[in-house]
From Swiss-Prot:
This is Kunitz-type serine protease inhibitor homolog beta-bungarotoxin B4 chain. Residues 31-81 form the BPTI/Kunitz inhibitor domain. It comes from Bungarus multicinctus (Many-banded krait). It comes from the Eukaryota. Gene3D superfamilies: Pancreatic trypsin inhibitor Kunitz domain. Expressed by the venom gland. Keywords: Disulfide bond, Ion channel impairing toxin, Neurotoxin, Potassium channel impairing toxin, Presynaptic neurotoxin, Secreted, Signal, Toxin, Voltage-gated potassium channel impairing toxin. The keyword Disulfide bond applies.
Length: 85
């Protein structure tokens, strides 16, 4: 990916939290699902939202496409799963 593409991605990620009104943000339903730790392909570091801890936690994702509660970064996890209401 070019440096311009990376800057655009960073800008979009930053806007994720900034443009959504705090009072209307709801956690995505997939964020309540447990992490899928089955191994199907290469194991990579990922993050999932842990509702009991109210935070994102690192885990080993095996590439099985399990559910929507797996993210490439802690930032993306927090952006999608933290609830502001």
């Amino acid at each position: 990916m070019s440096s311009g593409g990376l800057l655009l991605l960073l800008g979009l990620l930053t806007l994720c939290a900034e443009l959504t009104p705090v009072s209307s943000r709801k956690r995505h339903p997939d964020c309540d699902k447990p992490p899928d730790t089955k191994i199907c392909q290469t194991v990579v570091r990922a993050f999932y939202y842990k509702p009991s801890a109210k935070r994102c936690v690192q885990f080993r994702y095996g590439g099985c496409n399990g559910n929507g509660n797996h993210f490439k970064s802690d930032h993306l996890c927090r952006c999608e799963c933290l609830e502001y209401s």
